C-alpha cells in the first residue's frame, strides 16, 4: 500500500477529526504543474527549473502546505500539553483535572492517547517530507528542501516540537518496567537506548522514517539534566541554557534578550519560550539513578553558588558599591 493511502486510512480511522496534510489535493496541484512544465518544454522554453511565475508554486502549493502544517503542529502541541499537564498535576489540581477530563480517567487511556499523539505527529511529518520530495522531483529544484528549512525557523516542523520528546518520555514513564531499564520500549519500534553512556530516544514508523532525539547537552557534553527545549527544538541542561542566554538562574530564561541565539542553530529569540521537559527528566532519573544522584549533588552546589553571586551583586548595586 502506498503511503498516501496509508495516510488517508490512518486519518479516517482516528477517533476524532484532526488537522492533516491534504496529500490528494497537493498531488493534484503538482500534477497540474507538471503538465504546465511539459507544455513549456514542448514550446522550447527552459525546462531545468520551475518557471519564475508558476502559479502553483508561488500562490497555491507552499501557502497551502504552510497553513496545514501550522494547524497540525498547533493541534498536536495543544493536545500534548493538556495530556502532560494531567499526568504531572498533583493534589487537588490533579483531582479536578481528572474529574473534568472526559475519557482520560484510566491509566490505559492515558497510555493509548500518548501513543496516538506520537503516531499522529510522526505520520504527518512523513507526509510533509514526502510531498516536498515530490515537489523537488517534478520541478528539478531544491525549493522543497528550502521550505523544510523555513518550516524549522517558523516552528512548524513537528519533529522539532519539544512536546514530541516529552510525549515519548511520558509514554515510557507510564510503561516503565523495573526488570528492563536498559532499553524501554515505546510501542515496538521506539526506545530509550544508551550507546557509550550517551542516551538517545529512537523511533521507527511506517518503514520510511527514523526519529533520533539525542539527549546529550551540546554545551556540557553530558546527559541533559533538568532539561529544557528551546523554541527551535534543541535540548539543553537548564543551567547550560541559562549560561548560553547570559541570564541568571534566579531571573530564568524568560528574561533572556530576544537577540540571544541557540548555540547550535544560531536562531535568535528561542530562549524566552523554552519548555521544561519534566517527563524526560523523570525518565532519565529512573534510567540512570547512580549518575542522577551524583548530578543532583553537583547541581545543588552550583545553584547555591550562582544564587549567592546573584544576590551579592544585587546588594552591591543597591548600595552603590
Swiss-Prot record:
Among SMART domains, the record links this protein to:
RING
Pathway the protein takes part in: Protein modification; protein ubiquitination
Provide the catalytic activity annotation: S-ubiquitinyl-[E2 ubiquitin-conjugating enzyme]-L-cysteine + [acceptor protein]-L-lysine = [E2 ubiquitin-conjugating enzyme]-L-cysteine + N(6)-ubiquitinyl-[acceptor protein]-L-lysine
Q: What is its EC number?
A: 2.3.2.27
**Single Gene Ontology MF annotation:** transferase activity
Q: Which sequence ranges form a coiled-coil region, renumbered to this chain?
A: none
User: What top-level class of enzyme does the UniProt entry assign?
Assistant: transferase
In terms of superkingdom, the source organism counts as Eukaryota
**Cited Pfam families:** zf-RING_UBOX
| GO BP terms | protein ubiquitination
Q: Where is the SPX domain?
A: 1-149
Keyword list (alphabetical) reads: Metal-binding, Transferase, Ubl conjugation pathway, Zinc, Zinc-finger
Q: Where are the zinc fingers (RING-type)?
A: 217-266
Q: Check the record and name the InterPro entries matching this protein.
A: BAH1, SPX_dom, Znf-RING_euk, Znf_RING, Znf_RING/FYVE/PHD
Domain annotation text?
The RING-type zinc finger domain mediates binding to an E2 ubiquitin-conjugating enzyme.
Its family? Belongs to the RING-type zinc finger family.
Q: What is this protein called?
A: Probable E3 ubiquitin-protein ligase BAH1-like 1
Tell me the organism.
Answer: Oryza sativa subsp. indica
Amino acid at each position: 500500500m502506498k503511503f498516501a493511502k496509508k495516510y488517508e486510512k490512518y486519518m479516517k480511522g482516528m477517533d476524532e477529526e484532526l488537522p492533516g496534510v491534504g496529500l490528494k489535493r497537493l498531488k493534484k496541484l503538482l500534477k497540474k504543474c507538471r503538465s504546465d512544465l511539459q507544455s513549456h518544454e514542448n514550446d522550447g522554453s527552459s525546462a531545468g527549473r520551475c518557471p519564475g511565475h508558476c502559479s502553483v508554486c508561488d500562490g497555491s502549493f507552499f501557502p497551502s502546505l504552510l497553513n496545514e502544517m501550522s494547524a497540525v503542529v498547533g493541534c498536536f502541541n495543544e493536545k500534548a500539553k493538556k495530556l502532560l499537564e494531567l499526568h504531572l498535576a498533583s493534589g487537588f489540581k490533579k483531582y479536578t483535572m481528572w474529574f473534568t477530563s472526559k475519557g482520560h480517567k484510566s491509566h490505559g487511556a492515558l497510555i493509548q492517547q500518548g501513543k496516538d499523539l506520537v503516531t499522529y505527529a510522526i505520520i504527518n511529518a512523513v507526509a510533509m517530507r514526502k510531498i516536498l520530495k515530490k515537489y523537488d522531483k517534478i520541478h528539478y529544484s531544491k525549493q522543497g528542501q528550502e521550505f523544510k528549512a523555513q518550516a524549522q525557523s517558523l516552528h512548524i516542523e513537528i519533529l522539532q516540537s519539544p512536546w514530541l520528546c516529552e510525549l515519548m518520555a511520558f509514554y515510557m514513564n507510564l510503561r516503565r518496567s523495573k526488570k528492563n531499564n536498559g532499553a524501554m520500549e515505546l510501542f515496538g519500534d521506539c526506545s530509550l537506548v544508551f550507546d557509550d553512556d550517551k542516551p538517545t530516544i529512537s523511533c521507527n514508523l511506517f518503514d520510511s522514517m527514523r526519529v533520533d532525539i539525542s539527549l546529550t547537552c551540546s554545551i556540557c557534553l553530558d546527559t541533559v539534566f533538568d532539561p529544557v527545549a528551546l523554541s527551535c527544538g534543541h535540548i539543553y541542561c537548564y543551567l547550560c541554557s541559562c549560561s548560553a542566554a547570559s541570564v541568571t538562574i534566579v531571573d530564568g530564561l524568560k528574561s533572556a534578550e530576544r537577540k540571544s541565539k541557540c548555540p547550535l542553530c544560531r536562531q535568535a529569540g528561542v530562549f524566552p519560550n523554552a519548555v521544561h521537559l519534566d517527563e524526560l527528566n523523570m525518565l532519565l532519573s529512573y534510567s540512570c539513578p547512580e549518575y542522577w544522584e551524583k548530578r543532583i549533588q553537583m547541581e545543588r552546589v552550583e545553584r547555591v553558588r550562582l544564587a549567592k553571586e546573584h544576590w551579592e551583586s544585587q546588594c552591591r548595586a543597591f548600595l552603590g558599591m
